[in-house]
Design a protein with these regions (language model features):
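Canonical tetratricopeptide repeat
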Residues: 42, 75-76, 109, 143
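C-terminal cap/linker of serine protease catalytic domains
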Residues: 149-175, 248, 274, 315-374
């Protein structure tokens, strides 16, 4: 209850930070050097880098209340993302980008968050505005290059440095040892069984492969290949059993039947990078059956192993390799629960906006990292 109350207060505290005293000139410079504020920012950054998003949020909020400045606000945004609060991070980043136009950091982070959240056109407009104000800024140039060169985009180099980071920090679950340095991205995968297992393309795994999975919050756990499942194997898929349960948050898995052809749909996937990352959302309309199989056409871009979500943000399936040039997906459906006695007729959930879809699915898709032992 305490955690829910604290999270619910983040938006109000962010608004309070926006209304903090606007110091100017020498006064602002002096306030920025206040020992207490400097210590708070350093502690918050340390908490963030070790994956303690809750503590980092608290300390960045306190620093933001002391001075209306971009450094604490950017920390708040990254801490909110580390905590899975995409919508709050996006809303506050819009403020930071608009208020602190003298520096490119807020604008390029806003462009990145818009892009991974499926709002490509708005992301391009924001980034173009940043480049117009700061044409020689190396951070803006690096973001421009990353967003233009790959889809989904992959952060590397300057974009993984602490002060400019466009990704979460890694955090091992259950005090496990981290993956070794040679571990490489092999595929996307989808969390199932309430976060105890993951489904992925079997082709991503070798015969002597050690495996880890990592979500969009940087949370990481080792995994092992489960016994063969005929229904999955027939579609070239395999199941991983996770060493530690990976939280799925408010995300739901579909039960009953798959969405009808022509229904709005989304895919959430990571780019082919080895570092922690925020996944990217793509959207369109789900297609119909592929010939006489139980596969369906995706109808829009989606990387193999990506999570397929319906218009309510519910996990409905996993993307597969292209068939006849078209991306396909396989429904992953649970049996319908037995109706409870005396229950009222179910009410269908309302459709969600893309930022809600992203936040709902953020914990459902994972990076698969592998090393091949001799």
């Amino acid at each position: 209850m305490l955690a829910r109350t604290r999270r619910g207060s983040v938006a109000l505290l962010m608004i309070g930070a926006c209304g903090a005293l606007h110091a100017h000139g020498d006064e602002a410079a002096a306030a920025a050097r206040l020992p207490q504020r400097v210590a708070l920012l350093a502690r918050a950054q340390s908490e963030l880098e070790r994956g303690d998003a809750s503590a980092a949020l608290d300390d960045f909020e306190r620093a933001a209340m002391m001075l209306h400045a971009a450094d604490a606000e950017l920390g708040l945004i990254r801490a909110a993302m580390q905590d899975g609060q995409y919508r709050r991070a996006l809303a506050f980043c819009a403020h930071t980008a608009g208020e602190h136009v003298d520096a490119a950091d807020g604008g390029v982070l806003y462009a990145w968050l818009l892009r991974v959240g499926g709002q490509s056109s708005q992301s391009s407009r924001v980034l173009a505005d940043v480049r117009a104000h700061a044409p020689e800024d190396p951070l803006a140039a690096a973001v421009d290059h990353a967003l233009a060169s790959r889809s989904p985009p992959v952060a590397n180099g300057l974009l993984l440095e602490s002060s400019h980071r466009m990704a979460p920090w890694p955090a091992m679950l259950a005090s496990q040892a981290p993956p070794p340095a040679p571990a490489r991205f092999a595929s996307n995968a989808v969390l199932v069984d309430d976060g105890d297992a993951a489904v992925l393309p079997a082709s991503a795994l070798g015969t002597n492969t050690r495996v880890w999975v990592r979500n969009g919050l940087g949370q990481t756990t080792a995994a092992t290949l489960a016994a063969s499942d005929a229904s999955l194997a027939s579609h070239g898929l395999a199941r991983l059993v996770l060493q530690a349960r990976m939280p799925v948050g408010d995300s739901k898995a579909a039960a009953g039947r798959a969405p009808f052809a022509g229904s709005p749909g989304y895919a959430l996937q990571f780019g082919r990078g080895d570092a922690p990352a925020w996944p990217t959302l793509t959207q369109g309309f789900l297609g119909g059956l592929v010939r006489d199989s139980d596969l369906r056409k995706l109808g829009f871009d989606g990387a193999t192993g990506a999570a397929v979500l319906d218009a309510n943000g519910t996990l409905v399936g996993i993307t597969l390799a292209a068939a006849d040039g078209d991306a396909t997906w396989l429904p992953l459906l649970s049996p319908l629960p037995a109706p409870s006695t005396g229950s009222s007729a179910p009410v269908g959930p309302s459709l969600l906006a893309p930022d809600q879809i992203y936040e709902s699915g953020l914990r459902r898709v994972v990076q698969v990292l592998v090393t091949n032992d001799p």
